[in-house]
Design a protein with these regions (language model features):
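Helix-turn-helix
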Residues: 10, 18-52, 56-57
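Amphipathic alpha-helical linker/stalk segments
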Residues: 57-85, 119, 123, 136-138
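All-alpha amphipathic helical-bundle segments outside canonical DNA-binding/catalytic cores
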Residues: 81, 120-121, 125, 138-157
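Hydrophobic/aromatic residues within well-ordered alpha-helical segments
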Residues: 50, 57, 61, 65, ...
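Hydrophobic alpha-helical connector segments
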Residues: 71-102, 130, 151-158, 205
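Generic hydrophobic, amphipathic alpha-helix propensity
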Residues: 7-16, 32, 57-61, 65, ...
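C-terminal peripheral helix-coil segments that are non-catalytic and often amphipathic
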Residues: 92, 127, 131-143, 147, ...
């Protein structure tokens, strides 16, 4: 017999799948209950409303993004290794959570309250990363190994090239003659290496 906690987790997992696939407006609590193997009444008993269930899922996903950025810069590495590791860790996070970017973007765009949640969760961590990155950049500029660069612009460039990969690659694969998972994995590996070199070449002196 499933415990209360098991039932709650099953509902939450089913809700994540439903919201990630269909967004808030397209998701149905009846579908979530069916996926979780519980009654519709039980779903509302544990989570009350669709809004409360969505808010929990959204906060969890935003927290996941925030946590992925916390230790992304290792100041003990040399500069290029630190940047390459930043790109790699972020790329791997997106690879493991391919639907997350579109989900967060769509829900933030459609609801200002979600933007506030995102801002409160992400901004302090982004600021910490920027401070670390600025220190690394200043050191490298003094050593004349890189060009002066705004740390925020560098972060935006990194996030952009990685995120665009996971927005467009699934579409491009549909038009490729080779649609195997092995081919897709190889393409992603090559793209990650390309992103690293693109960013490093853009700041090298």
């Amino acid at each position: 017999m499933k415990s209360e906690t098991d039932k709650e987790q099953l509902i939450l997992k089913a809700a994540e799948e439903e919201f990630l696939e269909k967004g808030y407006n397209g998701a149905k609590t009846t579908s979530i209950a069916q996926k979780a193997g519980v009654t519709h009444a039980m779903l509302h008993y544990y989570y009350r409303t669709k809004e409360k269930l969505f808010e929990l899922v959204f906060r969890n996903k935003v927290r996941l993004i925030a946590d992925s950025l916390k230790y992304i810069l290792d100041e003990n590495n040399n500069f290029e290794d630190a940047i390459a590791n930043f790109i790699h860790v972020h790329f791997e996070f997106l690879k493991k959570n391919p639907r997350l970017v579109n989900f967060v973007y769509n829900e933030v765009y459609s609801n200002k309250e979600n933007l506030d949640i995102l801002h409160r969760s992400i901004f302090p961590i982004i600021q910490e990363v920027l401070n670390k990155l600025n220190s690394l950049i200043e050191t490298e500029v003094k050593k004349e190994t890189i060009k002066p660069v705004n740390p925020l612009q560098l972060i935006l460039n990194i996030l952009s090239v990685n995120i665009m990969t996971f927005i467009f690659y699934p579409i491009m694969i549909q038009y490729s003659e080779n649609k195997s998972s092995a081919y897709y994995k190889q393409m992603l590996k090559e793209r990650e290496e390309s992103n690293i070199q693109f960013i490093l070449n853009s700041i090298r002196k």
